[in-house]
Amino acid sequence: MSRQNWVETSALVECISEYIVRSYGDTFIGLTSTDLSTLSNLLSNLSIANVGFLNDLRTPLQNMSNEFVDFLSTTDRCGFMLRPIWFDSDINPAVTDNFVNSYIKLRNSVPVSDVIRQVNNLSLHNDVVLKIYSVQNAIIRALDPPYGTKVDPTNLFRATALKPSNYGQRRSLCTQLGAGVEAVDFFVSERGRMVFGRRSPNALQAAQYDINVPNFWSVLDVTNARVYFTNTFLGCTITNVQVNAQNGQNPVAFIRVNTDQNDINVDSDAIVSFSLAGGVINVTTAVPMTGFAIAIEGDFHFQMNRCQSYYTGVSITLGAQVPIDDFGIMKHLEIFRMRLLACGQAEMFAESMNRLTMQLIANYTQDNFNPNAVAFATPWYRISERFGVILSFIDQNINLQTRRLMVRHLWVIYSFIAVFGRYYNIN
């Protein structure tokens, strides 16, 4: 079955699961006959004539999860899903697999966007935040994730050979600069805030200083933000910065971004919102300072229409320390992982995921792949580190673009595991 059919069906599973959990509580593990009328009303409201995997409304979601795990655990059954052609096209191959025929039948109904729009109707749900379908489309088609969803900037950091990792800068920021060393700019993030500035062993004159915003953060907006001087990062003291400069009753400094030509005072109680799209933050100091560190603390979001180049290509760089789980898919795998442990199936599924991943890599590299070059030191559900291995294992025949496609392809399969595996229970 085509990639997009999988995505649309998983979006429908996500919608129905959210609806039932909200209606019946977190203890729900499957459909029973008592759920039929409620679910039938929901499907009627969605104008869905053929609901794919729920053709028989008495089919428990638990059975669906069990079938999916069995399907995914055998690479000759899910082999088409592991091929580049599955990701790149919407063809509909002839399938004979029981799981696909029984539960993921093609939906000749309203498009998934209309399904989502109607499911999110306030008359049906007053506070539902659906979690996975939007980022599936963001990864696959470079569509935008929801702008109301907060983004943790620390998840977006991209280390490169010439630029250290985000948390890896802590030690250097805490180490005094030597005498005669030129001023050094920095831009880091911890949960809920960004910290940027210029460290200097000598006094910096009152002037304008341009601090470059890393490209992986230039796709963000910040709302409900406060801007202030600081000298800490991850609980440690940043050296060679001054935090308590005085200028009487006047501001010590203000910042300005290219997308907003209004001054934003530093150390103010003002609550501000602005975009980092300009790529540069201008810092104007009113008094000499021995370096400065400025924090932006607020709610970060993706800018509208800026996701296209973000996740689907240019931001994924070569290296083992590249975090890839930007949209937090790993936390959605925990429900399934706990069910695997409870059923005693964790090791078996881990072996299946290793085989699946190796087969996917081999499909993208054809005859050039050396399986001995890939060694996963972390379990299957720690996807950021696994993706880092894919981006960094030594094989001169595999270029960065191919590695990016592998990561994106595997991310979508993980999203299906998070959706279809949430009710797994073999007992």
Curated annotation (Swiss-Prot):
Q: Which pairs are disulfide-linked?
A: none
Q: Which GO terms describe its biological process?
A: fusion of virus membrane with host plasma membrane
Please tell me whether the keyword 4Fe-4S is annotated for this protein: no
Q: Name one GO cellular component term.
A: viral envelope
Q: Which GO terms describe its molecular function?
A: host cell surface receptor binding; structural molecule activity
Entry superkingdom: Viruses
Q: Which UniProt keywords apply?
A: Capsid protein, Host cytoplasm, Outer capsid protein, Virion
Locations listed in the record: Virion; Host cytoplasm
Predominant subcellular localization, coarse grouping: virion
Against InterPro entries, the record matches this protein to:
Capsid_hemagglutn, Phytoreo_P8, Virus_capsid_a-hlx_vir
Free-text function comment from the UniProt entry: Capsid protein which self-assembles to form the outer icosahedral capsid with a T=13 symmetry, about 70 nm in diameter and consisting of 780 molecules capsid proteins.
Q: Assembly and partners?
A: Homotrimer. Homomultimer.
User: In which family does this protein belong, per the annotation?
Assistant: Belongs to the phytoreovirus outer capsid protein P8 family.
- Quote the protein name from its UniProt record: Outer capsid protein P8
Source lineage: Viruses, Riboviria, Orthornavirae, Duplornaviricota, Resentoviricetes
